[in-house]
């Protein structure tokens, strides 16, 4: 497989972020002459760089902006993190190989983005990635915490190039992340979790040129009270089915879909659109050209 990073057979997702002040210099060895070799072995993997055109396409489909906190899993020579930082995002690379971490820091410094792009040496399997904190905190060896100035922010974008089995292992945890988190995987899918979008690099790419985007959906599985009716839902990733029962009248749910916290479905000829807000859903229903407000609460 090809990547701009090491793709570990035993990796999962990521560590707490480094501060922007220390991220470009912590542990750096300016005189190091290490250069990665295509095909070199890492932790259960080999390393091959991803074409920059695909890196750019992945960040484009994720709609990365300066408001994002991007975390790259197995960040290799740092090109994805550096590219995200060039877009103004705060970006963190997690990499197991310490030589690659130092190389990434040098590359970030050369690109002039050390204030936005940080890197740490870590096994992402041993981290609590949903609680990662951008800019404010990171974990030192021995679990000694260190804090820095900055505002906390959970990851909004995850980029990865892992083997299919690892994607499946990460999937349950990713699905429990904040709704709206964008996940972009180079080349490999998430099994039966259907991608929301698929893109290809158009130039400078001769292999492994496809990427998948998923948007983490809100969780709506269960029973909800919708006025005098009971809404029972069964969720499968960003899609759901179920029924809306009003007394003895039961209407099946059709076209149930979630995009982050946006929910849409049809029941009994009425189209419902709205937003999931924790234990409530609310929005507008349309039936026969007539609109009405609706609200449901989790039971």
Describe each region flagged by the PLM.
Residues 218-293, 298-299:
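Central antiparallel beta-sheet cores of small beta-barrel/beta-sandwich binding domains
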Residues 112-124:
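Conserved SAM-binding strand-loop segment of SAM-dependent methyltransferases
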Residues 90-95:
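Conserved SAM-binding motif I beta-strand of class I
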Residues 78-82:
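Glycine-rich SAM-binding Motif I of class I
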Residues 142-147, 157-159, 164-219:
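C-terminal substrate-binding/active-site "lid" region of AdoMet-derived donor-dependent transferases
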Residues 104-105:
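Conserved SAM-binding loop
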Residues 20-22:
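N-terminal signal peptide c-region/cleavage motif recognized by signal peptidases
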